[in-house]
């Protein structure tokens, strides 16, 4: 029996964040008749500091901190995040309660002049702010110039259209959700550019309150949850933040969980890869096993060098 009549969602103000929050609002109101859901839009530090690469100012956690403070202060009941922005650790009293169904997890190649990444001429300028993409692009195409690109999806597309870049790389999920799929020139296969941990999935964080957890439970997608938990366990075991060249992508194949992961030097000079399979129920164990394979190859040395810079 539901006693709660209303629920407040903390969200960032970017168009994509608002799309995600409205998606969760619509799902909740459809499932729970009579529940009134309101959005509490907030500005985060990551939205304000746009002239500095994320890795230098504390990484993706900057998009989450203010929302978590709103939960802890009781100003909101749940927070909706892109899973790839969610840090590995949660403040005391908060939890990741729900992972919703994943959109396309691949990276999108967006260009007004070229059809694919491999068609770009030598010396072409490619925009991405992600060290994960940077290291994989540099290994694939060491002849390209990779320049930093920050801002929301609309801002990034405008910079491309202004001629600042020959191409930019964005998460396909964001473009699809914003109704901008026509801007996707081509999708980059995961064998060429392995996605970020949690890419394409929406997660819901809340206080550790049974009533709220029950409200959110129907929104969980079991398949996406298993995949993202495996990816995050791998990242956590490597003690990888969001601002390091770590990639991880799991799928369910023939009833088993299949996880691929990599750790790379930012310049693409070395990329370590590992993969593994397990029962779907053993997602977190699989993540740790794959991380161990990377550590045996020397992943910790690459990461220590990055952290010391």
Curated annotation (Swiss-Prot):
Name of protein: Porphobilinogen deaminase
Modified residues (S-(dipyrrolylmethanemethyl)cysteine): 242
Pfam family membership, one: Porphobil_deamC
Purpose of the protein: Tetrapolymerization of the monopyrrole PBG into the hydroxymethylbilane pre-uroporphyrinogen in several discrete steps.
Alphabetized CDD domains for the sequence: PBP2_EcHMBS_like
Entry GO CC: cytoplasm
UniProt xrefs under InterPro entries: HemC (IPR000860), Porphobilin_deaminase_cofac_BS (IPR022419), Porphobilin_deaminase_N (IPR022417), Porphobilinogen_deaminase_C (IPR022418), Porphobilinogen_deaminase_C_sf (IPR036803)
Lineage: superkingdom: Bacteria
Keyword Magnesium in record: no
Subunit text: Monomer.
Co-factor binding comment: Binds 1 dipyrromethane group covalently.
Pathway it works in: Porphyrin-containing compound metabolism; protoporphyrin-IX biosynthesis; coproporphyrinogen-III from 5-aminolevulinate: step 2/4
Top-level class of the enzyme under EC nomenclature: transferase
PROSITE patterns in the record: PORPHOBILINOGEN_DEAM
Catalytic activity: 4 porphobilinogen + H2O = hydroxymethylbilane + 4 NH4(+)
